[in-house]
Design a protein with these regions (language model features):
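Short cytoplasmic-facing helical segments at TM-TM junctions of multi-pass membrane proteins
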Residues: 108-147, 173, 177
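Cytoplasmic-entry segments and transmembrane alpha-helices of multi-pass inner-membrane transporters
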Residues: 48-81, 97, 107-115, 122
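Glycine-rich helix-loop "coupling/hinge" segments at transmembrane-helix boundaries
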Residues: 66, 83, 161-190, 194-196, ...
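Alpha-helical membrane-interface segments at transmembrane helix boundaries
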Residues: 24-32, 66-69, 82, 86, ...
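C-terminal transmembrane helix and the adjacent membrane-cytosol boundary/short C-terminal tail
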Residues: 56, 111-114, 118, 190-250
Length: 250
């Protein structure tokens, strides 16, 4: 308990909020590194995932590659890339963390398109829509919550892993952990960890809100309709009797 109080004392110490190595600067660096990593991963993985989800081809290969990429030890890859390139900038961890972020983004993209009701796609084709129109006007809008969910999962992994990437001389919140360890300032180490957790929670909350906002209203209505009626094609509304109302004796 004393260590936690000391960590919060370090976080709220005004002296730690000034200068190039202060909390705002390190927080901005960490957020920028994470955003850059997510953008690179999305640019690579989302188009591939959309192509796989739309055509249904190479899904098994995508699953296998995603599993293999998840198994790569990220810290080991960061150090390895730094050694073979003799580069101590953000490039080695940026490459390694982009590789880490690709699998969840890829999975979210192709599983999102696979979740779209095939009857909806068949109806779009029957209306004369081209494959590109089906992709951009039907499949992507309906699968957007799952696509955002994949990016959301990748964001949390990236934010956490950029912390250990500070084993190289780069910025970010991980600097507080490694610099604190070097001088045995455990309040600084724990305070840096608290900041990483706070950044991850805020990021997750933002993505959760976005994920809810991109859900099409028709999808929600469709779920209510399925609950109220076993027949998915029966419209919701007042029931109409199957026989005429009146004097049956006439």
């Amino acid at each position: 308990m004393t260590d936690i109080l000391a960590a919060f004392g370090w976080v709220f110490d005004p002296a730690n909020w000034a200068g190039a190595g202060g909390i705002p600067a390190r927080l901005g660096e960490h957020a920028w590194y994470s955003l850059l990593t997510l953008v690179l991963a999305a640019v690579i993985a989302v188009p591939i995932g959309l192509a796989i989800g739309h055509t249904g081809t190479f899904r098994g290969l995508a699953v296998g590659v995603s599993g293999a990429l998840r198994a790569i030890p990220t810290l080991g890859l960061v150090v390895y890339l730094a050694l073979i390139t003799l580069n101590l900038s953000i490039i080695p961890p940026l490459i390694a963390l982009t590789i880490l972020a690709i699998p969840p983004v890829l999975a979210g993209a192709y599983s999102g398109l696979e979740s779209v009701d095939r009857r909806t796609i068949d109806a779009a084709r029957a209306m004369g829509m081209t494959e590109l129109q089906i992709l951009f006007k039907v499949e992507i809008p309906l699968s957007l919550p799952l696509i955002i969910g994949g990016i959301r999962s990748a964001a949390l992994q990236v934010i956490a892993t950029w912390t250990v990437a500070a084993i190289l001389p780069v910025g970010g919140l991980g600097r507080f952990l490694f610099d604190g360890l070097a001088v045995q300032r455990y309040d600084e180490m724990l305070g840096g960890s608290i900041l990483v957790i706070a950044l991850a929670l805020v990021t997750d909350g933002v993505f959760a809100i976005v994920q809810r906002l991109v859900v099409p209203r028709g999808v929600t209505a469709g779920k209510i309709q399925d609950v109220r009626s076993k027949d998915p094609w029966r419209p919701i509304g007042p029931s109409v009797p199957n026989h005429p109302v009146g004097n049956s004796s006439m």
